[in-house]
C-alpha cells in the first residue's frame, strides 16, 4: 500500500481537497486503484449537527455517515464509494481510545496522546485504507490522506505526530507528502515568505515535504519557483504551480502538465505494483474522457440559467454537492452554467415592505431563469419564499427540481393552491398544526430526542410504480424498476394526502419498499416538474451526472428528449457524441 499525504499551511480553505482529489484521479489514470481518507481535527464525532453556514455542506455516504464535504470531492473525482470510517475526526478517535480504555484493552497503563492516541490513528489509517471502494471489489493500491486544518494548529498536533511516526511504520518508499501553501500577490509581486515559514514549521514537526503545491491567483514566475525550491530544500521539479483556473476540473490536467505524476511514480516506486492490461486501458480511458469533459466545459457556448432558491446562500459551500451536480449536468449538456443565487426570504411579501430592491432583484432572477431548483434544508425560515418560487415554476411551465425539503415545499404549495388546503403546512415548521393540515409529517420511526445520527440516513431503494412509463425521471434512470439513492431527512409526505394529490396531477411515481413513503413526484402536462425526497446530488459523478439534475438542466436547455435518447455522451476524443 502506498500513501500520499496532503497537508496545508498558511491558511485553511486553500484547496487541499481539490488537490488531493486531483492527485488521486491522476493516479487512477495509471490504472491504479485509489482510496481516500480525510482527517478533520475537530471534536465533533461527525458533521451531522454542524451548521451549513459555519462548516459548509454535510455530505452523506452510502452507509449513512454524515461527513465533511471533501469526501464528496473524493467520490466525485475518483468514482469511489467511501464509508464513514474514511472520515477521521478528533471526536471519533478520542471516543475510540476512551472506549478501549474502559474495556481494559490497555491493561492498566496510563493512556496518553503518545503512544496510545497516535497508535490508534495509525491503526485506523492502515485498516480503512484497505477497504475496497470501487466496483472491482479489490484492495486499493494507493491511499490519499488529507490532513484538514493548518499544520501548526494545536487541534492537528496529535495527527501530525501520528503521520510523522507513520512514515517510518510503512517505509519511506511507501509514503509521500504534498504540502499545499499560499503564494500571495501583493502590489504585483509574488511573495514566498509565507511558504518558507510554513515549510519550516512542517520540518520542525518531523515531516519533510516531497512536493510543494503553491496556490496562487496567477502563474508562478520561474524565479519564484526557484526561490521556493532553494529556501525550502527541494528541487524545482518538486514545486508545483497550482494557479487559478476556469474550473477545478482543470486542476488534474494542470498537475499532469507539470509532470507531478512522473515524480510520484518514481518517488513511490509505483512500477512495483502489478497492473493488468485491463487496468492500464481503464486508466487511459479515464484520462481521455476527462479531457473530453473539460473540453466541453471550455467550448460550451449557450448559457443555461438556474435559479437556486435556498436559505444558506451566504455560504456557497452549503450547497457544494448541488453545485457540482449542476456543473456535471451542464457539461454533459454542453451548456455554460449560470447559477442565480436567490435567498428564499427575499421572495416573501415582508421583504417587499422592508427592502424593495432585494425583493425585486430576487423576483427578477426567478422570473428570468430557465429552470428553478429548491434544495434541501431545515427549519421554517424562507419556506414561504420557496413555495412562491415553486408556484411560479408550476404555473408558468418552468422546469423545476425539488430536493428533500424542496419536495415537501412543492407538495405543500400544491396542496394549498390546487387542493384548497389553505392552512396546509409541515409539522416541522408548526408542531401544533392540526392533523388535517399536516401535509408533511414526522416519520414515526425517528428519535425525537437525539439529534446526531438520528435521521433516515444513507443509501435506500426507491421503486417506480406501475404505469409510470410516461415519466421523464424514470426514462432518465434508463427505465429502471428501482433506484438506490442517499437520504437525510426526518419528515415525509403525509400518506393521507397522496390520493388527493395524485387525482389532481401530482403523481408520486417513486416510493419506498413499503409502497407508502413517497420518494419521487412528477407532474403530468409540465415540461419538467420533479422532486425527490432523497438527495441525488450526493451520488453525482463528474463523468456520470445525477439523473434528476441532468433532467433539470436538459429541460431548462430544451434538449430533454435528446438527452434521454443518449445523444449527449462523452466519447473520449474531446467531443461529445452529439
Swiss-Prot record:
Pfam families: CTP_synth_N, GATase. Its EC number is 6.3.4.2. GO terms for molecular function: ATP binding; CTP synthase activity; identical protein binding. It catalyses: UTP + L-glutamine + ATP + H2O = CTP + L-glutamate + ADP + phosphate + 2 H(+). Pathway: Pyrimidine metabolism; CTP biosynthesis via de novo pathway; CTP from UDP: step 2/2. Keywords: ATP-binding, Glutamine amidotransferase, Ligase, Nucleotide-binding, Pyrimidine biosynthesis. Residues 305-559 form the Glutamine amidotransferase type-1 domain. GO terms for cellular component: cytoophidium; cytoplasm. One of its GO terms (biological process) is 'de novo' CTP biosynthetic process. The keyword ATP-binding applies. The active site is at residues 404, 535, 537. Belongs to the CTP synthase family. PANTHER family: CTP SYNTHASE (PTHR11550), CTP SYNTHASE-RELATED (PTHR11550:SF0). Catalyzes the ATP-dependent amination of UTP to CTP with either L-glutamine or ammonia as the source of nitrogen. This is CTP synthase. It comes from Candida glabrata (strain ATCC 2001 / BCRC 20586 / JCM 3761 / NBRC 0622 / NRRL Y-65 / CBS 138) (Yeast). The lineage of its organism: Eukaryota, Fungi, Dikarya, Ascomycota, Saccharomycotina.
